[in-house]
Amino acid sequence: MKKDTKNLYKEKIVPSLMEEYGYKNVQLVPKLLKISINRGLGEEARSSKEMDANLKELAVIAGQQPTVNKARKSIAGFKIRDGMPVGASVTLRQDRMYAFLERLIHITLPRVRDFRGISAEGFDGRGNYNLGIKDQLIFPEISYDDVNQLQGFDISIVTSANTDEEAYSLLKKFGMPLQARA
């Protein structure tokens, strides 16, 4: 599975982007650097049982053990103390990144009800794409019976592209169902 996406990039996407943007060197062609998956835990961080369930869900979705993000300073208004767990994140690179991207594009996103493509507004101006997932049940790895509470997370796709247009073209060639840019 991961080899297919990686080979697609090397054999079809790189030559296509070189022709489209007039790159003289293969190293100039934009590529995927990493995919970060981040989830804020909120109230679930107080209960170790729910925290473990959240970490397990992220591990199943990403195929890699997440790291726990802890608060850097205390904020009384949010009832957060320094060092308390506030979120979890996973950074995928290389083969796991390509495997996750392929599952996201071909299996997960088509499972969304009334799906018409993802917004092209998620680019940050530097060639990276951010996507918010509202609930974890769109992933086939997650069983409905195991979920205590619907909770979303953020996916950041980091590329080496310099502009949003290059990143849009790169992701579109991977098969990402992006809506047309305005």
From Swiss-Prot:
GO terms for molecular function: rRNA binding; structural constituent of ribosome. GO terms for cellular component: chloroplast; ribonucleoprotein complex; ribosome. One of its GO terms (biological process) is translation. It is found in: Plastid, Chloroplast. InterPro entries: Ribosomal_uL5, Ribosomal_uL5_bac-type, Ribosomal_uL5_C, Ribosomal_uL5_dom_sf, Ribosomal_uL5_N. Signal peptide: none annotated. Keywords: Chloroplast, Plastid, Ribonucleoprotein, Ribosomal protein, RNA-binding, rRNA-binding. Its main location: plastid. Binds 5S rRNA, forms part of the central protuberance of the 50S subunit. NCBIfam families: PRK00010.1. Part of the 50S ribosomal subunit; contacts the 5S rRNA. Belongs to the universal ribosomal protein uL5 family. HAMAP family: Ribosomal_uL5_B. This is Large ribosomal subunit protein uL5c. It comes from Emiliania huxleyi (Coccolithophore).
